[in-house]
Amino acid sequence: MPSFDIVSEITMHEVNNAVENANRILSTRYDFRGVEAVIELNEKNETIKLTTESDFQLEQLIEILIGACIKRNIDSTSLDIPTESEHHGKLYSKEVKLKQGIETETAKKITKLIKDSKLKVQTQIQGEQVRVTGKSRDDLQAAIQLVKGAELGQPFQFNNFRD
């Protein structure tokens, strides 16, 4: 029976390139001259730390980072940006988390979405991915379009196609 997996992965190499590009843009921006502003990637924790001297500049850093991510084909919904900033002395900072894998809650939403559509496919939650199995390729393609059209707060990739 044909099947495929729904996953949500980010290539850390591309994230590293996006952070480097954002830092390069930051060094050429006139409004950040003489200002202590840093964008750092922590690959172990899968976080990006943004630090600068004012709350407004922090929002500008986020816009620079999102722009750099989009240029590297990283979906901006894969960045979990906190609403509140931390304030330490004269510096403001935010720690942006990268969404890797599908959480159980989101996997259950995907499963419910597919089952409610009455498609002739079965879904299984397997850790941080969802396996979709069906009798025909057309049903699987309909399931892919259904998940792509749903706004579930993070980007999904479809891989491991089997016939």
UniProtKB/Swiss-Prot annotation:
Domain of life: Bacteria
The entry's keywords: Nucleotide-binding
GO molecular function per UniProt: nucleotide binding
Pfam families: DUF520
Keyword field contains Lipoprotein: no
GO cellular component: cytosol
InterPro entries the UniProt entry points to: DUF520, UPF0234-like_C, UPF0234_N, YajQ-like_sf
Database matches in CDD domains: YajQ_like (cd11740)
Record-stated family: Belongs to the YajQ family.
Role of this protein: Nucleotide-binding protein.
NCBIfam families, per database record: PRK05412.1
Protein name in UniProt: Nucleotide-binding protein MS1759
Native species: Mannheimia succiniciproducens (strain KCTC 0769BP / MBEL55E)
